[in-house]
């Protein structure tokens, strides 16, 4: 398994990781909460490592080697009783690349050394139908995918209500996706405010859970 994060979550890094996957058959996952991810039509898609320990263990089940580039080897966020803290399977060898090495240059060089193809699968342009009926987490996700503007910045602190959003927006016009800082909550509103100040020419969408919003309403 190739686990990526950080600077690899933009176009060049995503393409390089997809090229390596095409050449070797390695499974590519990304960290649970990427700082900034470029997503949408025309870009390679990558599955996130699940937040819940038992689901993350299922994703990593059977892995003999875990190559970690520009992120950290995955551990649980909390010491839940009877739950694993280290998420990779017993016997899996973890290879963590030095963070001082440029991760994009590294993966591009690896792809070239492997003779990896230049063309890789990317998300097709596609939007869900604009929904009707009751307001649910699923219909909110469909509406977001149907209406998302080009070059939007999405701040995602939807938490448990956001399960349907990644699938509904995968083929939307290209956008940036900003996530939480690890297991902490409360960053969504100030992060969206900062994004709007930094990028006044882009539309910013803040997907905010009600409990998380209570921490930073002053933003």
Regions found by a protein language model. Name each.
Residues 1, 64-67, 153-155, 205:
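Conserved beta-strand elements of the Class I
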Residues 4-96, 172-202, 214-218:
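Glycine-rich, anion-gripping cofactor-binding loops and their flanking helix/strand elements
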Residues 10-14, 50, 54-57, 100-104, ...:
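Electropositive phosphate-/nucleotide-binding environments in soluble metabolic enzymes
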Residues 16-19, 55-58, 62, 105-113, ...:
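Alpha-helical scaffold segments in soluble metabolic enzymes
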Residues 22-26, 65-68, 112-119, 146-153, ...:
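Generic secondary-structure signature for well-ordered alpha-helical cores
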Residues 81-119:
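Terminal amphipathic helices with adjacent charged low-complexity linkers/tails
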Residues 121-201:
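Active-site diphosphate/adenylate-binding microenvironment
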Residues 209-211:
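Active-site beta->alpha N-cap acidic-glycine motif
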């Amino acid at each position: 398994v190739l686990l990526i994060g950080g600077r690899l979550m933009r176009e060049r890094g995503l393409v390089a990781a997809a090229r390596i996957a095409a050449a070797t058959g390695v499974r590519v996952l990304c960290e649970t909460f990427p700082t900034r991810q470029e997503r949408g039509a025309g870009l390679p898609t990558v599955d996130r490592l699940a937040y819940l320990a038992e689901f993350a263990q299922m994703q990593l089940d059977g892995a003999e080697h875990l190559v970690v580039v520009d992120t950290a080897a995955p551990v649980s966020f909390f010491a839940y009783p009877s739950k694993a803290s280290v998420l990779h399977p017993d016997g899996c060898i973890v290879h963590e690349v030095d963070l001082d090495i440029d991760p994009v240059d590294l993966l591009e060089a690896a792809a070239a050394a492997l003779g990896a193809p230049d063309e890789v699968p990317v998300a097709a342009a596609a939007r869900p139908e604009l929904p009707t009926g009751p307001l649910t987490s699923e219909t909110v996700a469909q509406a977001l995918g149907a209406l998302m503007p080009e070059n939007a910045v999405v701040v995602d602190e939807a938490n448990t209500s956001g399960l349907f959003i990644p699938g509904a927006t995968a083929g939307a016009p290209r956008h940036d996706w900003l996530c939480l800082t690890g297991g902490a909550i409360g960053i969504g509103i100030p992060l969206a405010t900062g994004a709007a100040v930094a990028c006044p020419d882009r539309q910013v969408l803040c997907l905010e859970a009600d409990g998380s919003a209570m921490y930073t309403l002053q933003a």
